């Protein structure tokens, strides 16, 4: 797998988290498999490949790839504005997090504790999701730059939905960190659009064929 493909998997995961946040905010619903994929990426230890972080295939990143394609094509009919806003905000927050070694240490320690919870309850259990959400609230939510999620207040005010949204934002920021560690940079989204799209189209097609 090329370096660019590795970057696209991580960037696709940022956009996947963003689309799931938007879906919960608008509908109160989220596919359990996609939620599990993103939460599982927070606990991946010593993966052999980037894809392994997301369960070994990118089927559950398909909606993220679609949103990323829409952003890179700059086609108003396919552009998903809120997910794009959330994705860019997560990339921005990761840059701030990178300067906070103390916070990174806290996050690492708390994720170890959550791993123990997962072994007892399961990855998408409400107690585990609440712990992920609480970790986001205690760390990244304290930055001056906050991600303002727009949607239906009936869904946003439900505590379990709020926890899922925070947990997904945490996973998106983790994927943004991975993307940058793999050599990804925001300038690519402006100056390397065609190169990214040429590599992204086959990845998106492969996830669609797997689903049939």
Swiss-Prot record:
Q: Which GO terms describe its cellular component?
A: cytoplasm; plasma membrane
Q: What is its main location?
A: cytoplasm
This protein's UniProt keywords: Cell inner membrane, Cell membrane, Cytoplasm, Membrane
List, alphabetically, the InterPro entries matched: HflD, HflD-like_sf
- Write down the membrane topology: Peripheral membrane protein
Signal peptide range equals none
Gene3D superfamilies from the UniProt entry: HflD-like (1.10.3890.10)
Organism domain of life: Bacteria
Where in the cell?
Cytoplasm; Cell inner membrane
Instruction: Tell me which Pfam families the record gives.
Output: DUF489
Family as reported in the entry's similarity comment: Belongs to the HflD family.
Q: Which PANTHER family match?
A: HIGH FREQUENCY LYSOGENIZATION PROTEIN HFLD
Name of the protein this chain belongs to: High frequency lysogenization protein HflD homolog
């Amino acid at each position: 797998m090329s370096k660019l493909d590795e970057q696209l998997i991580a960037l696709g995961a940022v956009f996947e988290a963003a689309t799931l946040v938007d879906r919960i905010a608008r509908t109160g619903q989220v596919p359990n498999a996609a939620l599990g994929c993103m939460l599982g990426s927070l606990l991946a230890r010593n993966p052999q490949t980037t894809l392994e972080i997301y369960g070994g295939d990118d089927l559950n990143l398909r909606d993220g790839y679609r949103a990323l394609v829409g952003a890179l094509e700059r086609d108003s009919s396919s552009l998903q504005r809120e997910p794009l806003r959330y994705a860019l905000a997560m990339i921005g927050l990761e840059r701030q997090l990178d300067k906070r070694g103390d916070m990174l240490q806290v996050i690492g320690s708390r994720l170890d504790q959550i791993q123990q919870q997962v072994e007892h309850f399961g990855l998408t259990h409400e107690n585990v999701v609440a712990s992920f959400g609480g970790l986001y609230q205690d760390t990244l939510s304290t930055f001056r730059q906050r991600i303002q999620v727009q949607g239906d207040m009936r869904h946003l005010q439900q505590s379990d939905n709020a926890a899922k949204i925070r947990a997904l934002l945490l996973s998106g920021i983790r994927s943004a960190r991975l993307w940058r560690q793999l050599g990804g940079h925001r300038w690519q989204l402006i100056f390397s659009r065609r190169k990214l799209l040429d590599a992204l189209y086959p990845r998106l097609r492969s996830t669609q064929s797997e689903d049939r």
